[in-house]
Amino acid sequence: MASVCEICAKGELSGNNVSHSHLKTRRTWKPNIQRVRAVVEGEVKRVNVCTRCLRSGKVQRAL
């Protein structure tokens, strides 16, 4: 599944896990992407959307 929101273009962020002894290893933070049926430009399509866009009403869900 794609890890980019098709509405706001939110994607993965990278950084470090930091242990108690301050050793650092790389890690990624992934957005909560849901594949939903939505009305896009008058037609129903399946789009990958983050949950923040769903909650804020930026996506019109198809019935």
UniProtKB/Swiss-Prot annotation:
One of its GO terms (molecular function) is structural constituent of ribosome. Keywords: Ribonucleoprotein, Ribosomal protein. The gene is rpmB. It comes from the Bacteria. This is Large ribosomal subunit protein bL28. InterPro entries: Bacterial_rp_bL28 (IPR050096), Ribosomal_bL28 (IPR026569), Ribosomal_bL28/bL31-like_sf (IPR034704), Ribosomal_bL28_bact-type (IPR001383), Ribosomal_bL28_sf (IPR037147). GO terms for cellular component: ribonucleoprotein complex; ribosome. Belongs to the bacterial ribosomal protein bL28 family. PANTHER family: 50S RIBOSOMAL PROTEIN L28, LARGE RIBOSOMAL SUBUNIT PROTEIN BL28A. It holds the Pfam family Ribosomal_L28. One of its GO terms (biological process) is translation. The keyword Metal-binding does not apply.
